[in-house]
Amino acid sequence: MQLFEQILSCYGWEGAALAGATLLMLGVQLYYYIFVYGRIPGYKNNRRPQTLDREPSVSVVVPLFSEDYSFVEERLPLILAQNYPDFEVVIVYVGHDSDFYEDLVRLKQSFPQITTTKIHLDPRFPISRKMALNVGIKSAHYECMVFTSTDAVPQTDRWLSLMAKGFMRGEIVVGYCGVERGKGFSNYMMRAWRMMHSADWIARAVQRRAYRGTLHNYGFTKSLYFGANGFSHLNMNIGEDDLFMQRVMTRDNVSVILSPRASLREKMWGGMGWWMSQLRYFGSAFRFYPRAVKTFVRWEIGSRVLFFATVVCALAVMPPEYKLAALLLAVIRYVVVAFEVRRIARRLGEGGIAGRYFIYDLLGPLWAAALGAMLLRRDNRVWR
């Protein structure tokens, strides 16, 4: 109380209000990075009760929407080389190239664990990823299924083993998928954005309040899928990894697999413009999230912006000692943020992010604002 009265006498109501707003936003930021994101590095899924007594057989389902020989020659072998005793790879080819499909079928001669099915592509009736996954689920021979994409690259031969172990403690398994590492500012921003936005749903999942996974690295059981009567929001081409998952996720049926050996990397097919287009496409589902989830996601960015604004205001108009105090609070916040980001990056197998994180820390809200403006316009690619 004496401190407040001293601030009030020295700097007036304006200075006291500014100090209060700065401290409040700092408190929100520290709460997020220490008590929310800070739980990610120390999380252990094996603390959850075990429901299966042995590692299950697993079907890996991969939708293939083009004649992608680079996937067949480069990324499919990494899936087939997984160090796991009993699994199959279900490839759902959506297209009309008979020669390419025959090449896929012939792969079974060398790799018996491959199961291939085809959906004929008719331009009059577009096939969504949900439809392809539905066919893959029905074609899978095993109860436990892991879903990935043709763009995702396993980093080790332990990926499938670790994901499969998750089914011993839950009907749903979620893992992390980062962005492939490259050179330049754009690649760094894309990698940092992916990691920190993944930290949102991972942090909620380790708190047993899961609301989504990533379409490149997640799984669930057949019983769960058919018990929910399949995917939801069938008028949308997206939502299989979030809107559907929100229907079936509970406090007790989600396993979170966090390990550099279980992480994937998504191959990038363009620069910043392509990436923003992807964020707009998949981000169109966000408006249908529960209000509590939207509030949780927005408060971190909002409190960061308000904290920066109060510090800038203090540096611009307040006396020297006030400026020094505001600058000290900014330094304290960044030290805490950088420390926690480094811990999270280490747990997820991300390198080269923490050292330059101040770039993303400052520019991330501007990027989020640009994406929010893009989402105000309807994306016709989303709707059927």
Name what the model sees in each region.
Residues 116, 121, 125-128, 132, ...:
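Long helical/loop segments within the catalytic core of UDP-sugar-dependent glycosyltransferases
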Residues 304-380:
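Membrane-embedded multi-pass helical conduit in multi-pass membrane proteins
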Residues 1-52, 341:
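N-terminal membrane-anchoring/stem segments of glycan-assembly enzymes
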Residues 150-165:
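Acidic donor-binding/catalytic loop of UDP-sugar-dependent glycosyltransferases
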Residues 76-123:
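Acidic donor-binding segment of Leloir-type glycosyltransferases
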Residues 145:
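Short aromatic/hydrophobic "clamp" motif used to bind/position activated sugar donors
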Residues 172-197, 223-226, 231-294:
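Catalytic donor/gating beta->alpha subdomain of glycosyltransferases that bind UDP-sugars
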Residues 56-59, 88:
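Cell-envelope/extracellular polymer assembly enzymes that use nucleotide-activated donors
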